[in-house]
A protein has these predicted regions:
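Hydrophobic mid-bilayer segments of alpha-helices in multi-pass membrane transport proteins
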Residues: 32-42, 49-70, 92-98, 266, ...
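Alpha-helical transmembrane segments of multi-pass membrane proteins
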Residues: 126-138, 164-177, 190, 204-235, ...
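Extracellular/periplasmic helix-exit of transmembrane alpha-helices
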Residues: 104-107, 185-200, 367-374, 442-463, ...
Length: 590
């Protein structure tokens, strides 16, 4: 063998070894990045620890990985923690607003009227869950997003007689279909739009005569259609979960018995949702779908359309397990005393919630009003000198501020003793928020360290990207099947569809391009999966639980919400696989 040939062989072998080393390193980093997530699952679901006990440990583990494995500077880790604490204040502000409004309405007597109103629509708890959680919750998600729907719907369900754990489960399950277009389209308009390399992709699209706006609208349409198919069955899934885990007979069948009404309610939302998404864009599908479904489903329920003749209810409250009960209690005695004092119209009782919805829409749609609310803010830019780490707290623009405004209006118009009602509501709400605050103080800083780990001295991919690359490398040609799972993983970590889309949209795009399949469809799967991941996002569960005073039971909620999450990402994966490999969908750049 000549020296030249031997040298070539050595070079090839060297490259081969280098490639193996790179793959090995990527695998190790990917596995280590998953460690905090795996430990969360083991502690919360396997060992049934509370989040109060789990999350401080997970924060320490994540910080240790960031410093010793990812070579993040201590300064960057510290700035991420500060950023997380500011975000925690924002989350707790929303939670406090939701609880404060509910407690105010309890003391004005409005909750008694609302409870009676739902009984008049239908005494069937399955129907009540569909109307409040699905229809009203989807509308709230479209208007506000960021967990507000669950924070408002869960205490409202408790107020009309649902067990706290069941109310949280229903609230978490609506963190799915409407989420991709929540907060007037933020997960798409901000998340996907800013998560992609717009300049580079626009140049590639231009070669095919496609503009950036058209590409983003194509993604929006695909997200709406995928959600529309899967989401149609979510109301049925919700009531089946309700009867299985909270019915006296522990029966799936009792939930399935209402399938005609549940599917009808699903379609009442998803049809206008899909039409709006395809023809009008990402801002209004959840808003329009929610409004239309409220009008149609409430009227149908009043007329008994498709509602089973046999009414389903929970067992008497005295027979409920202690884990079902939260600290938010609306007793029958309170209701009787309140109603004996004065009568209140149904419209007046509901007015504070209608005002919340109106303020949310106005603050997200009208830029002048939006700017006015945002003028009161605390902004931290370049925290500890880290130019890409910042945080802000806008008390009036955040839903918490709008909820507080509605509570003040409610006290002014619904009772002759507004100061007394507000004082009692404040004391009760503060106790609940302080309990949730302890958990979130550890949870959200952990998330920010995880997300900000991409800037490091080792020049390795961030923890989210490393874990996603591990999935992609493992699944190769069946990657479309798990692309939604990656999106869900991002939301599980960050507690946000928007943040998951910002983290993983470019990664999903690159994976699609390398496999020569439709990048728009894979990014759509990312967005759908990220919406589904909100059902198991830890700090969303903690926040929703806090609104009903149910702390320490996060694992019990997660063990249940994992079922609809698996359904969602699996169904999405099957739809995307079928679109690509059976129906041959391509689209731009495929």
């Amino acid at each position: 063998m000549s020296r030249q040939n031997k040298g070539c062989d050595d070079l090839v072998q060297g490259r081969s070894h280098n490639q193996k080393d790179v793959i090995l390193n990527q695998t190790i980093y990917g596995l280590l990045a998953l460690l905090p997530i795996v430990l969360c699952g083991i502690f919360l679901i396997g060992l049934q620890w509370s989040a109060k006990k789990t999350m401080p440990i997970i924060l320490v583990v994540t910080a240790a990985l960031a410093i010793f494995i990812w070579d993040m500077t201590l300064n960057r880790v510290s700035s991420s923690i500060i950023q997380g604490l500011v975000i925690t204040v924002s989350v707790l502000w929303i939670v406090f607003g939701a609880i404060f409004l509910l407690n105010t309405l309890k003391h004005t007597g409005a909750i008694a009227v609302i409870r009676a109103g739902f009984t008049n629509v239908s005494p069937d708890r399955r129907v009540q869950a569909i109307i409040i959680a699905w229809c009203f919750g989807c509308f709230l998600e479209g208007a506000s997003g960021f967990g507000t729907a669950a924070a408002i719907a869960a205490p409202l369900l408790v107020a009309i007689g649902f067990p706290a754990l069941g109310a949280v489960l229903m609230g978490m399950m609506i963190q799915s279909t409407p989420v991709s277009f929540g907060a007037v389209g933020t997960p798409i308009v901000i998340g996907v739009n800013n998560g992609l390399d717009k300049a580079a992709i626009s140049a590639q699209l231009a070669q095919e005569g496609v503009q950036w706006g058209e590409f983003l609208q194509l993604i929006t349409s695909q997200v709406a259609i995928i959600h529309g198919v899967i989401g149609t069955f979510m109301p049925l899934f919700m009531v089946m979960m309700l009867t299985r885990f909270f019915g006296k007979n522990k029966s799936w069948k009792e939930g399935f018995a209402i399938w005609p009404f549940a599917i009808f309610a699903g379609l009442a939302f998803t049809i206008p949702y899909m039409i709006t998404g395809v023809f009008l864009g990402p801002e209004f599908p959840s808003l329009v779908g929610g409004l239309v479904s409220i009008a149609i489903v409430v009227n149908a329920a009043k007329r008994g359309f498709l509602v089973p003749k046999t009414t389903w209810d929970f067992a008497p409250q005295k027979n409920w397990p202690s884990e079902w009960l939260g600290k938010l209690v609306v007793s029958k005695e309170d209701i009787t005393l309140t109603l004996s004092d004065k009568k209140m119209s149904t419209l007046m009782a509901w007015f504070p919630y209608l005002l919340v919805a109106l303020l949310l829409v106005f603050s997200r749609v009208f830029t002048g009003f939006q700017s006015l609310l945002n003028s009161v803010a605390v902004d931290l830019t370049s925290i500890l000198g880290e130019t890409d780490i910042s945080a802000s707290f806008s008390p009036l623009y955040l839903p918490g501020g709008l909820l507080l405004i509605s509570a003040l209006v409610a006290a002014a118009f619904q009772t002759r003793k507004p100061v007394s009602a507000l004082n009692s509501a404040f004391k009760e709400s503060t106790k609940t928020v302080l309990g949730a605050g302890f958990v979130l103080v550890f949870t959200i800083p952990m998330v920010r360290i995880f997300i900000n780990s991409g800037v490091n001295l080792s020049d390795v991919a961030s923890m989210p990207v490393a874990s996603a690359e591990l999935f992609a490398g493992t699944f190769d040609n069946v990657f479309p099947l798990i692309s939604a799972t990656i999106g869900a993983l991002g939301a599980f970590i960050a507690g946000s569809n928007t943040v998951s889309n910002m983290m993983f949209s470019q990664f999903q795009y690159e994976a699609a391009m390398s496999l020569h399949i439709s990048p728009s469809l894979i990014i759509a799967a990312q967005a759908v999966g990220a919406a589904a991941g909100n059902m198991v996002a830890i700090h969303n569960v903690v926040a929703a639980s806090a609104t009903v005073g149910l702390l320490g039971m996060e694992g019990a909620t997660l063990r249940r919400t994992i079922l609809p999450t698996i359904y969602y990402v699996l169904f999405c994966g099957i739809i995307v696989m079928a679109a690509i490999y059976i129906f041959g969908f391509q689209g731009p750049l495929a």
